[in-house]
Amino acid sequence: MRLFTHGQVLALLAFVNTISAIPSFSTNSYPAHPAEPVSIFSQHQPQAPLGLWTRLRNSVIERVWGVPPQQRHRGGNKHQYPPFSAPASLRTRYGDDVVLRFKLQTADEVKALVEASNILFLDVWSSTDEWIDIRLAKDVVPSLLGLLPKSLQTTHVPLIRDLPQTIYESYPSPFQSASGHERGFLPSGEPSSDVTNIFFENYQPLSVIVPWMRLLASMFPSHAQFISIGSSFEGRDIPALRVGVRPANDQKRRRTLIIEGGSHAREWIGVSTVNYVAYSLITSYGKSKSISTLLEQFDFIFIPTINPDGYVYTWETDRLWRKNRQETSLPFCPGVDLDRTWGFEWNGNATGDNPCLESYGGDKPFAGVEAHQLAEWVKEQTEQRNTKFVAYMDLHSYSQQILYPYSYSCLSQPPNLENLEELAMGIAKAIRLTNRKTYAVSSACGGLMASQKKKAKPETFLRMESTGGSALDWFYHDFGVKYAYQLKLRDRGSYGFLLPRENIVPTGKEVFNAVMMLGRFLLGESNAFQELDWDAGFQRPNKDDKPILNDDDDDDDADTNDDGIGRKDDSWIPDEYKGDNDRDESDGGWAFRRLRKR
């Protein structure tokens, strides 16, 4: 328990009083569930559940002053409620969209899938050396299959059959999760008994994250500072936490690590994970010798989302929005991909003059406002603030991968490739020992590689999208950060970007231990990659961590054969279209409707 001085307690009280005046975020911020149980505090006086900030305030008071927490299940209410249907607004926006996975074996298959995706303006969710996930309208599936070779027509796997419903169930309930209502498609689980984890029981909107960050900084002023990296296109601050303890009169350049998430707005798990790691380091200082040493030797810059405009947009309008929200040459296709707009090997020609593409990198290097703001900030810190950036970790989702430079090309190798691979394997080991999750380690070049066991050499495939202009490559090559990684977090496709909230804390612990492993490596510890020392600051999995995904293996494809190859599912194809490879004018109509929905 961290001790507070009298002055700090008074300051915290003043801040908590300020926070308590902030109204709970409106249910208009996301599709509210149409019915929720009401907590009964007496037989005659029903009361609405406590607002989020009231509960956060109470949890702070309970933690700091040792007030016994109130019982979280009043009256023993443990009734289960049936899932509610997605509201009409979501059905209108997402229609009958689904997500399919295609297993790839040959370069011709990849080429055909790339061309078909571009023709139909399809949303590619993720791609690895084994599969590609694509979102599309159900009635467009036969048209897509008609453009593909027969081998792909028989190897598509349904991942998400009802996208609007899955999106609806990914939003947090405006009521406390302990109320007893659990989403119907998830196994029920008790909320964490640790009152300090209340913030991580759900994904949080930006209107909650920023005051929470300020609260942390005010509680722990000795080693946490709330800062702004710059301003977004719409004028929002890009919030961050600087965590570390710099000795007085220290003239050495301060070694600093950046841990960033949310450059792609829809990847909520990256935002929550950055917050979790920051919280864990801040609250463990002075309790763990290993963590205290890290914060005395390094500064950590935690940026939950470099894309605040896009993140807010995913809460208020389109849950699956990827880019930022700045204007482009086409008024109905706003946004720049903030991970394709950086200056090193920017490849804007790959996306042409089409701002409607999800990977559009802008019309020039650093066209993305927020990427330019971050680049200018790190330059200023280096030139004027005596800072040396030694590591960069960019959190994305999904597919469970640890990627190192380069992203723009598989033909170039970084000079310290062996060290990058060694550390990446150590990070993967730390994650595996935490929750038995397997993360693949590879270059981020993005060239899909055929996994054909009969071939002596893998075959380089055509890419699904441009991979130039990445933040990973810029920090490594242009800015000289020796250890730069992109982590693609859970899962491997069962939920994709709509990862249920039960995974927030387990994923946070995995990445926290990965950061601890990174810190030990940077400190030069000779035993950094040996078994995790659970008494040296690493976080153990516990009974409250109930990941809903299979931990026995990481093949999350529910609809696969025993050999791992997907089977054809004719339920996606209307009877009148089976065997008919002709396209009609409805293809273009669906694509245009999708663009207009933006």
From Swiss-Prot:
SUPFAM superfamilies: Zn-dependent exopeptidases (SSF53187). Its cofactor is Zn(2+). Residues 539-598 are annotated as: Disordered. InterPro entries: Peptidase_M14. Residues 202-522 form the Peptidase M14 domain. One of its GO terms (molecular function) is zinc ion binding. It is found in: Vacuole; Secreted. The keyword Secreted applies. Residues 1-21 form the signal peptide. Binds 1 zinc ion per subunit. Substrate binds at residues 264-267, 322, 339-340, 397-398. One of its GO terms (biological process) is proteolysis. Glycans are attached at residue 349. Keywords: Cell wall biogenesis/degradation, Disulfide bond, Glycoprotein, Metal-binding, Secreted, Signal, Vacuole, Zinc. Its main location: other. SMART domains: Zn_pept. One of its GO terms (cellular component) is vacuole. It comes from the Eukaryota. Zn(2+) binds at residues 264, 267, 396. Disulfide bonds join 333-356. Residues 564-581 have a biased composition (Basic and acidic residues). Residues 22-174 form a propeptide. Inactive carboxypeptidase that may play a role in cell wall organization and biogenesis. Belongs to the peptidase M14 family. This is Inactive metallocarboxypeptidase ECM14. It comes from Ajellomyces capsulatus (strain H143).
